[in-house]
Regions:
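Buried hydrophobic packing segments
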Residues: 21, 206, 297-305, 356
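Extreme N-terminal starter segment of soluble prokaryotic enzymes
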Residues: 1-5
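N-terminal glycine-rich phosphate/adenylate-binding segment common to multiple enzyme folds
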Residues: 45-145, 156-158, 245
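N-terminal beta-loop-helix "entrance" segment that forms/cooperates
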Residues: 31-53, 228-230
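Flexible, glycine/charged-enriched surface loops at secondary-structure junctions
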Residues: 32-36, 181-190, 213-221, 310-318, ...
């Protein structure tokens, strides 16, 4: 059976790594009807938005998409396309496996953990007010009337909503994922010692949900202690479930344990839609040079194939990537540098994909 999938190449190195990914997926023999849709900075002039409505319509029809990285301006300009997609389709669970690969150059070995990040609320909800906005003054008066110490008049404000329903939904997802994938422990990560209302709610809900899963070990950990623990003893962790902001930060930390963002796949899962993507940025400084590492995008495609029920093909891709990295003869410059301290002998993006295809069993 053929599967309908939207492919969003993205900005920067996105077209190169998605081309490599597509070739690997097609080499498995799985039939994919690719619906290629452009989004990002490159379509702003034509459509006046980085995320045109027809792209949303295409994803809504297929309910499965895979994308390359899309540039997000820092501080000014349009808001993140990634965040917009997550909010539009209520892709509430960001799942990022972090698994050591042979030859990844990391000082850590045998890391095998999964980040489950709440994707739709917290400080990333996008409820912000610029310095000088009337809403900032209104909020200042509200805080003052509540008897709490107010903030400086020249502040910009971001609101941090944490709800019972969305906390329960993400923690239940983490436990169901652990049970489905044979994982043994779930750790809820928080800062409830300081943010007693918001993170306190998240922790309380996590404990309530954990009581319904007696077969899965549960603990909770403060986010700063979690960061220290991850770099000291990553073996102590299995599945971590976190609110949005902490999940974003900690997932990048965990990517660093396994060779960097070039090795880190990701998925964004909702009730009836899923979007898969490499977790790194668009790297415009190396775009068009055929030197980007497509490993994360290829492994994200393996996650997509699992989602589509093509588990055999997904496992073949993962094994082929591991074999290519382990052999070490045809790897991109970032991997070569990590392995040997030099980029000498490195191959390009498409040549790496060729090597993965050769290793497909």
């Amino acid at each position: 059976m053929a599967h309908d999938v939207v492919l969003i190449p993205g900005d920067g190195i996105g077209p190169e790594i998605t081309q490599a990914m597509r070739r690997v997926v097609e080499a498995t023999g799985v039939q994919i009807n690719w619906n290629v849709q452009e989004a990002g900075a490159g379509v702003m002039d034509e459509f006046g938005t980085p995320l045109p409505q027809h792209v949303l319509d295409a994803v809504a029809e297929t309910k499965v998409a895979i994308k390359g990285p899309i540039t997000t301006p820092v501080g000014t300009g349009f808001r993140s396309v990634n965040v917009a997609l997550r909010k539009h389709f209520d892709l509430y669970a960001c799942v990022r496996p972090c698994l050591s690969q042979p030859g990844d150059g990391s000082r850590f070995r045998d890391v095998d953990l999964v980040i489950v990040r709440e994707n739709t609320e917290d400080l990333y909800a996008g409820i912000e007010f610029d310095e000088g906005a009337a809403e900032v003054e209104e909020l200042s008066h509200l805080v003052e009337r509540s008897g709490q110490k107010t903030f400086a008049a020249d502040s910009a404000i971001s609101i941090k909503p944490i709800s019972i329903a969305k906390s329960r939904r993400i923690v239940e997802y983490a436990f169901e994922y652990a049970r489905r994938c044979g994982r043994k422990k779930v750790t809820a990560v928080h800062k409830a010692n300081i943010m007693k209302a918001t993170d306190g709610l998240f922790l309380r809900v996590a404990r309530e949900v954990a009581a319904n899963y007696p077969d899965i070990e549960f603990n909770d950990k403060i986010v700063d202690a979690t960061c220290m623990g991850l770099v000291q003893n990553p073996d102590d962790f299995d599945v971590l479930v976190l609110p949005n902001l902490y999940g974003d930060i900690v997932s990048d930390l965990c990517a660093g344990l396994v060779g960097g963002l070039g090795m880190a796949p990701g998925s964004n899962i909702g009730a009836d839609c899923a979007i898969f993507e490499a977790t790194h940025g668009s790297a415009p400084d190396i775009a068009g040079q055929d030197i980007a590492n497509p490993t994360a995008e290829i492994l994200s495609a393996a996650m997509m194939l699992d989602h589509l029920g093509e588990n055999d093909a997904a496992n073949r891709i993962r094994a082929a990537v591991s074999a290519t990295l382990d052999e070490g003869k045809q790897v991109t410059g970032d991997v070569r540098r990590a392995q040997t301290g030099s980029v000498e002998g490195a191959v390009g993006t498409q040549a790496f994909a060729d090597a993965v295809i050769e290793h497909l069993a």
